[in-house]
């Protein structure tokens, strides 16, 4: 399944190892017992989450294919417990694909981590026009440099942070939950929130018990609980 995100981005689950039962079996291996009844297995997952026994969830592993603006990817890569492989602009030419927002935000004075949408239509349109003009000019210069024979590894330095990139992300469920705590939250940048919310949908579908327990006992954000 592919989730369309932002104007040109996407999120795909391309591989997965384990599910709720993988965490159950990992937790019970210490005393030689495996899967029991579904009710007891679910209760065990809830017990593990409530009491902070998180290592069994490392046996559930997801691999995602992500297309996102570079500024989103750079925030994503700060989650270091996981494996990343990204498309290289040293060896490939960038396509004419950039994130063009449909709204403009301004900072909240009381909370520097939050930003709210601008209602002033004149200000909004002026800002969006400036953004689009800057992007178009940067890409024009990039193409001119390539046509002059400048190496891709040098020509790329003029490209904006709104350029789309693609990468694979392999992550275990424990680290994925940490990602959701930080990015499925109103303090995170709006663009990465959109990816986090779709990851949460996949997590809920593939590991419903673990996701339910996570929301009940370990989730520290606000967007998955009706936050703004």
UniProtKB/Swiss-Prot annotation:
Keyword Flavoprotein appears in the UniProt entry? yes
Instruction: State the Gene Ontology BP annotations.
Output: dTMP biosynthetic process; dTTP biosynthetic process; methylation
Q: Please list the residue ranges annotated as the ThyX domain.
A: 1-217
UniProt xrefs under InterPro entries: Thymidylate_synthase_ThyX, Thymidylate_synthase_ThyX_sf
Cofactor annotation remark: Binds 4 FAD per tetramer. Each FAD binding site is formed by three monomers.
Give the Gene Ontology MF terms in alphabetical order.
Answer: flavin adenine dinucleotide binding; NADPH binding; thymidylate synthase (FAD) activity; thymidylate synthase activity
SUPFAM superfamilies noted in UniProt: Thymidylate synthase-complementing protein Thy1 (SSF69796)
Find motif (ThyX motif) and give its ranges. Answer: 78-88
One Pfam match, given by its short name, reads Thy1
Arranged from A to Z, the UniProt key words for this protein are: FAD, Flavoprotein, Methyltransferase, NADP, Nucleotide biosynthesis, Transferase
Q: What is its EC number?
A: 2.1.1.148
Q: Which residues bind FAD?
A: 55, 78-80, 86, 172-174, 178
Q: Does the keyword DNA damage apply?
A: no
Q: Which cofactor does it need?
A: FAD
Quaternary context:
Homotetramer.
Function recorded in the entry: Catalyzes the reductive methylation of 2'-deoxyuridine-5'-monophosphate (dUMP) to 2'-deoxythymidine-5'-monophosphate (dTMP) while utilizing 5,10-methylenetetrahydrofolate (mTHF) as the methyl donor, and NADPH and FADH(2) as the reductant.
According to UniProt, the name of this protein is Flavin-dependent thymidylate synthase
Primary gene name = thyX
